A protein has these predicted regions:
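N-terminal Rossmann NAD(P)H-binding glycine-rich loop of SDR-like oxidoreductase domains
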Residues: 1-20
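NAD(P)H-binding glycine-rich loop region in Rossmannoid oxidoreductase-like domains
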Residues: 41-87, 95
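NAD(P)-dependent short-chain dehydrogenase/reductase
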Residues: 154-160, 164-198
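A hydrophobic C-terminal alpha-helical subdomain
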Residues: 189-193, 199-204, 253-299
């Protein structure tokens, strides 16, 4: 069972499981089923926030991949974030325990950890965020992990995966990063800020998550990172592939704050999530740049592919979808 099956991670996870000969059931409240086209999966509409509906959905399930989450850096969504990411996780854990699921793989995030000290490598033993005033999404992932660990003590066999930033193909909706990627490719963003982030290819993440079913230890968390990629280099690779110059100007960091009103208006007019917010700037500005992911590499065989391959395949996917000119 995959919760949030039509999302970016869920879409790639479905394909990886099918490739491994595993029967897949997906639950999703969203009726956007493009992620399932031509896939042999069992679709069950529902929501992790509807505790009662999970009884029939979990019937006969052996393994659960809990990917369903609200990924938003807009504080106006904090109640929804809490409902889905925290209480939804509690419902999934309760249903998993009740239906005697063999294994739960819970998808958390590197953002669940306390960021400080920034200069130290981010490892699995880093304390989780406790500050109630923290970014709502970050705090929700930390609290959800605490719930998973609580259920492990009750007998649930669960392992936790902390991806860094996620990118790659089969991003149908698309994700926040996917929309940014498309906007850059279409020339809708003319300037660059010299920052970056650690990104893992979603296909590598899916492979590692499947391996975690058999190799992941109960209650253990695994950081699944990729490569640090700054947006200047990303735009260079994209420019070369598309044959046109992208992100022509590099601006100082403070200009991001100047752009906040524009992105707010844009999100309201176009009725899509706001990509640039105070919290997203905070995430970029105060990040852990050293994320070795050694435990996942050693125990789960995680092997990140190159930045160039990921960008090329992501471009091809969006071009095939008709969203890049």
């Amino acid at each position: 069972l995959i919760t949030g099956g039509s999302g970016h991670v869920g879409a790639n996870l479905s394909r990886e499981l099918i490739k491994n000969g595993i029967k897949v059931r997906c639950i999703d409240f969203d009726r956007d089923y493009r992620a399932y086209e031509n896939l042999d999966v069992e679709l069950m509409p529902g929501s992790v926030t509807d505790k009662e509906s999970l009884n029939s959905i979990f019937n006969g399930v052996d393994i659960v991949f809990h990917t369903a989450a609200v990924i938003s850096l807009e504080r106006r969504n904090k109640d929804l974030i809490r409902s889905v990411n925290v209480e939804g996780t509690r419902n999934v854990c309760e249903a998993s325990l009740k239906h005697k699921v063999n294994k739960l793989i819970h998808f958390s995030s590197v953002d669940a950890f306390n960021r400080y000290p920034l200069e130290d490598p981010l490892l699995e033993d880093r304390p989780l965020i406790e500050d109630r005033k923290a970014v709502p999404y970050d705090l929700s992932k930390a609290d959800a992990q605490r719930i998973v660990l609580e259920y492990c003590e009750k007998g649930l066999d669960a392992s936790i995966i902390h991806p860094s930033g996620v990118y790659g193909p089969h991003d149908y909706k698309p994700s926040l990063f996917g929309q940014t990627f498309v906007d850059i490719a279409n020339g809708k963003r003319q300037f660059n800020v010299n920052v970056g982030y650690d990104y893992v290819d979603v296909r590598d993440l899916a492979k590692t998550a499947v391996k975690c079913v058999t190799e992941g230890e109960v209650g253990q968390n695994y950081i699944v990172s990729g490569n640090y990629m700054d947006f200047s280099y990303m735009s260079e690779v994209m420019s070369e592939e598309l044959g046109k110059q992208l992100l022509k100007l590099t601006m100082p960091m403070f200009t991001l704050y100047l752009g906040l009103p524009f992105y707010y208006i844009q999100s309201r007019v176009m009725k899509r999530p706001q990509v640039l917010t105070m919290d997203s700037i905070h995430t970029i500005k105060y990040q852990n740049k050293i994320i070795p992911g050694t435990l996942a590499k050693e125990k789960l065989g995680h092997s990140p592919r190159s930045i160039e391959e990921s960008i090329q395949d992501t471009l091809k996917f969006f071009i095939d979808q008709g969203v890049i000119n």
